């Protein structure tokens, strides 16, 4: 056995003690090192112990908000598939109203011995939350990556879409169609993605329509909930202020905006244009098919996994924010402004 350990150690470039830990399934070995030892076994023609055949590299926690918004299951699927390809087993922990909190889910995952955690739209996106919870987690030696949100108080990799650019794409599209009264429906202001969307929206409306920032924020921005009902309420208010187009911070809100327009006897897109955000699964098949700003979910999910595995493997990525560009997808819910039709 000693000769065998020495051969494997030499082939893998690690100590015999490390080889022993891998063969006996002991913790405390980096994923990349474990893979090197298993590869050495294969190269030297040794048969892998039964427990190491198709063995998971470990558990990785994924904490998401409620799954009613279809963008979260889509992102969870991308992350789960990427983890599985790397030999890890994803453990999905979902927050629900009245259910477990993020802190409780984190504690549960740590107790289960996860190798790391990916947070999606968690408390790191809430400017009123205590960010010390993440520093305490880091002190426990648990690597983590934060998706959709940012805080300079947390030393960790962040993965985000460019929310400001998303609003610029949406507003520019609507202005090109002749709309001059464009509203924005989005969630509570304490969330970082909301603040960034407002910044991008206000700046683009200022630049392209010449309105003051004060006027835009006071008359054209409506906060609500990230739900269909929330979008309906916000859009009703904006249409009541003579908006002929509404940009929504999620596709679910956009579906609510379409419902609001119809309940007011208006047609989408003939009377009111609606733009969503996310490009959730099946959103192309709504009536009308929704024009939306596509969140780069595959790229973000894969980057989150890659970054976390670098943290787990001991070669951490920079503790900064990786920002991914969104894409405008034009479908059937936007059209020329009512007053622009028929003009040469």
Swiss-Prot record:
GO terms for biological process: regulation of DNA-templated transcription. Residues 5-24 bind DNA. Pfam families: LacI, Peripla_BP_3. The keyword Nucleotide-binding does not apply. One of its GO terms (molecular function) is DNA-binding transcription factor activity. The keyword Kinase does not apply. PROSITE patterns: HTH_LACI_1, HTH_LACI_2. Keywords: DNA-binding, Repressor, Transcription, Transcription regulation. CDD domains: HTH_LacI, PBP1_AglR_RafR-like. Residues 1-54 form the HTH lacI-type domain. Transcriptional repressor of the maltosaccharide utilization operon malEFG. This is HTH-type transcriptional regulator MalR. It comes from Streptomyces coelicolor (strain ATCC BAA-471 / A3(2) / M145).
């Amino acid at each position: 056995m000693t000769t065998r350990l020495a051969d494997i150690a030499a082939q893998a470039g690690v100590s015999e003690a490390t080889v022993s830990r891998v063969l006996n399934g002991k913790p405390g070995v980096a994923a990349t090192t474990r893979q090197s030892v298993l590869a050495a076994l294969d190269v030297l023609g040794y048969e892998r112990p039964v427990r190491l055949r198709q063995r998971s590299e470990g558990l990785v926690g994924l904490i998401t908000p409620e799954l009613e918004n279809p963008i979260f299951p889509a992102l969870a699927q991308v992350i789960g598939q990427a983890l599985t390809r790397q030999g890890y087993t994803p453990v999905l922990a979902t927050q629900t109203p009245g259910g477990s909190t993020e802190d409780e889910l984190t504690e549960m995952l740590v107790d289960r011995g996860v190798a790391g955690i990916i947070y999606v739209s968690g408390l790191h996106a809430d400017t009123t939350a205590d960010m010390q919870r993440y520093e305490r987690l880091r002190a426990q030696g648990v690597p983590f990556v934060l998706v959709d949100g940012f805080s300079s108080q947390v030393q960790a990799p962040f993965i985000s879409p460019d929310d400001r650019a998303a609003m610029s794409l949406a507003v520019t599209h609507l202005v090109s169609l002749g709309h001059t009264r464009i509203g924005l429906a989005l969630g509570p202001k304490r969330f970082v993605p909301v603040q960034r969307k407002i910044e991008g929206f206000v700046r683009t409306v200022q630049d392209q329509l010449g309105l003051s920032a004060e006027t835009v924020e006071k008359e054209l921005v409506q906060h609500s909930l990230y739900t269909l009902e929330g979008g309906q309420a916000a859009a009703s208010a904006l249409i009541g202020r003579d908006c002929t187009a509404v940009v929504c911070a999620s596709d679910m809100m956009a579906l609510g905006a379409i419902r609001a327009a119809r309940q007011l006897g208006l047609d989408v897109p003939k009377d009111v244009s609606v733009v969503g955000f996310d490009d959730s699964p099946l959103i192309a098949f709504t009536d009308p098919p929704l024009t939306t700003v596509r969140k780069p979910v595959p790229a973000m999910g894969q980057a989150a996994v890659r970054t976390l595995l670098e943290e787990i493997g001991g070669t951490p990525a920079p503790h900064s924010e990786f920002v991914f560009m969104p894409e405008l997808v034009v479908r059937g819910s936007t059209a020329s402004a009512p007053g622009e039709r028929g003009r040469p």
